[in-house]
Every structure is written in C-alpha cells, then in structure tokens.
C-alpha cells in the first residue's frame, strides 16, 4: 500500500468524522441512550425479536397474533421520536457511506460514466444496496 493512498484515506476518514451525518448520528444516539423510555422500548423490542427467533428455531409458524405483536412493536419503535430520529440519522449516514463506496467502486472499475453503480441503473456493478 502506498503512502499516497494511506494519506488520501486519512483525509477521507477525517472528512467523514467531521460530516454532519456522523455528528447527527452521534447526537441522536446519545439522546436515545439517555432516554429511559426509549431504552425500555428497545428492550421490549429485543425481547419480542428473541421470542420470534425461538419460535422459528423450533420450526413453529408465526401466528397472526404474533405477527400483529411484532408489527405493533415495530410501530412503537419507529414512532418514538428519539428512536425515530436516531434511525433517520443512521439511514443518512449509511447513504453517505454507500455513496462513497460507489465512488470508490467506480474508480476501481475505471468507469468514468459510473455505469452499474447507481440506484437508477442497479447496483450490480458496485455491490451497493439500493433502497
């Protein structure tokens, strides 16, 4: 690995560390972790996930009642403002990283037109995940 590549990687890392996306992610995570109700909602959700995992591991089908409980729990998680803010910040940070990875993949593939590395044309060329 050349010194030039490492230097550029360090510059990129510093830019990511200073990004609004990372700052938002950290601040919303801190707020969510400090919120007792958010922590209880997360714990309840994790317990429900564990229950579903155990049912599936035993080969049992999920009943409508269990599915409704899961849906209600997901709505509660996504609807609680501190958790919702964190999830949105996490999504924005992930999108930024995906964009960076797409730029790197495009450069490595030596494709100046960016073919195959966008959500418009599909992600098969860069291995990214379009959502």
UniProtKB/Swiss-Prot annotation:
Species: Desulfitobacterium hafniense (strain Y51)
PANTHER family reported for this sequence: REGULATORY PROTEIN YLBF-RELATED, YLBF FAMILY REGULATOR
Family: Belongs to the UPF0342 family.
Pfam families, per the entry: Com_YlbF (PF06133)
Protein name as annotated: UPF0342 protein DSY1594
InterPro entries on file: Bact_com_dev_regulator (IPR052767), Com_YlbF (IPR010368), YheA/YmcA-like_dom_sf (IPR023378)
